[in-house]
Regions:
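Conserved active-site-proximal phosphate/metal-binding subdomains
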Residues: 120-134, 140-183
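Active-site entrance/lid segments in N-terminal catalytic domains of soluble metabolic enzymes
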Residues: 1-132
Length: 183
């Protein structure tokens, strides 16, 4: 977030109190808005959904499920809700449910939730909804970002691109292999 993007804490399968600790650490490092990603199939999703509100997190991204049951809780707390979608139908459903933004995630993403490529999915979703669309999947540099913007996305999401960053908790051997990779 300090660099100008919206930093996201990946809750993954972390215990709820670990997520709370990470949120508090993030607050110590920035006064900028940041979000938490919640995998909704995770058994801790409900607890983490509440922690987001209790800790005053400004945004939540969701995957692996429908955030509908948490929408009222988050919206009443002023949390921006940003679900990840892999189809036009899901994007429309999330817009009707009250999402503020959708992430159109193509098959190139680490989450690989659909069978449509990012560059094919983004313009379809942009044309189908009236809320902002963020492109995700296979975007690793300015060229991918520019392409997403040309297709109507208002932002991009990158994840794998940051695996080798100093902030990543991935093992150093893995980071080194990523850095050395040619293709």
């Amino acid at each position: 977030s300090n660099a100008g993007g919206l930093g996201i804490i990946g809750a993954a399968s972390a215990p709820p109190e670990v997520v709370r600790e990470e949120i508090r650490k993030c607050k110590e490092l920035t006064d900028k808005p940041f979000g938490v990603n919640i995998m909704l199939l995770n058994p801790n999703a409900e607890d983490v959904a509440k922690i987001v509100v209790e800790e005053g997190v400004k945004a939540v991204t969701t995957g692996a499920g429908n955030p509908g049951k948490f929408m009222e809780l988050w919206k009443n707390a002023g949390v921006k809700v940003i679900p990840v979608v892999a189809s036009v139908a899901m994007a429309k459903m999330m817009e009707r449910a009250g999402a503020d933004v959708v992430v159109a995630e193509g098959m190139e993403s680490g989450g690989h939730i659909g069978s449509t490529t990012t560059m094919a999915l983004v313009p379809q979703v942009v044309d189908a909804v009236s809320i902002p669309v963020i492109a995700a999947g296979g975007i690793a540099d300015g060229r991918g970002m520019a392409a997403a913007f040309m297709l109507g996305a208002e932002g991009i999401q990158m994840g794998t691109r940051f695996v080798a960053s100093k902030e990543s908790i991935v093992h150093e051997n893995y980071k080194n292999q990523i850095i050395k990779a040619k293709d």
